[in-house]
Amino acid sequence: MLCGGRSSEHDVSLASGASVRVGLAQAGHEAIDVCIARGGAWLHDGAELSVTPGRGLLGADVVFPVLHGPFGEDGTVQGLLECLDVPYVGAGVLASAVCMDKVVFKELMASAGVPQVGYLGVTEARWRFERDAVEREVAVLGLPIFVKPASLGSSVGIVKAEDDAAVGPALDAAFTHEGRAIVEAAAAGMEVECSVMGPTAAPEVSEPGEIVLRRGAGWYDFEAKYEPGGMELVVPARISAGAREAVRELAREAFTRSGCHGLARVDFFVDADEVLLNELNTIPGFTETSVFGKLWGASGLPYPDLLDRLASIAVARHREERRYRH
C-alpha cells in the first residue's frame, strides 16, 4: 500500500491509507506499508526503499496506490509500477494523467458531447501577458465562478469569486500551486456523486448519492469533505428517475471514454432533470467520511469486500495486459 506522497494532499493520503489498511486486514489481506515522504523518498519500516525494474515491489501480489494529487494520481507512480511489472489498483498511466488535468479531461468530455458546466483553461503565462483578454473570456462565464489549480484535488486551492474584483486574486492564488488553472461557471442544483468500479469496457456503477452541506457552508470545500459533520451523504440521491439514470449512464461513459480502470468517483451537478458532469477522480478519498466507499456500502458492497474486489480487478488486468507486453 502506497500512501503519503509529495503533493499538498499528503495528509489526506495518510488518512485514506489508515482506513484502507484496516479494510484490507478485515478482508484477509496482509498490507505492506510504503510511505512516500513529502520530499519524495519511499520508506518501508523507516528505511529508504530502492526498487529494480521488473522485480516487483517487496514481493507484493498487488500494489494499492492510496495517493492523491500530483506525483501519485497523475500517472507518474503508475508508470513506475508498470516498469516494476507489478499489478496495481486503479487507472493506468494515460487515464490517470488525463483525468488529473481538469482542463484536458473536460476537453475530452466536450469532444464526446458530454454536458458540462462552462469552463476556461488559463495558463500563468497567458494571465501575466494577456490579462485583459483572459478577463474578457472569464466574464463570459458570469458570476460567481470557481477558480481551481488544474491538477489538484480534495478542493485544495479552490477559490470562489463572487465579483469582478475577486477574479484576479483568485487566479493569482491558483498559480501559487501550479502554472495552469481552470475557471468554472457556478452550477445550479445539487451535487451528486457516483462510484464506478471494474474494467474499462464494462464497469459497475453505484447508486448515486447526494451531498448535503452542513448549515452555513457556501460550497463543498476541503473542510466539508474531510471534517466530521462537514457534510451528509444521502443515498439514494433525491433526484428523479430520469436524472438517476442519466447520472449513472454518464458516469459509465466518462469512465470508459477516459480509459479508466479499477475505480473512480464521478461528480455531477443536478438541477431537476438537467445533469452536468463536473469531474472524475481516479483515486478518490478512502477515509471514514469519504464518499466512494459509502456509495458502494449503500449499494450493498461492504468496505472490506470492496477493497478485495479492487485488488482482484487489478490482478486480472495485469494478467490480461501481459499478453501484449513483448
Protein language model features and the residues they cover:
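Active-site nucleotide/adenylate-binding loops and adjacent lid/helix of ATP-dependent enzymes
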Residues: 1-3, 57, 98-190
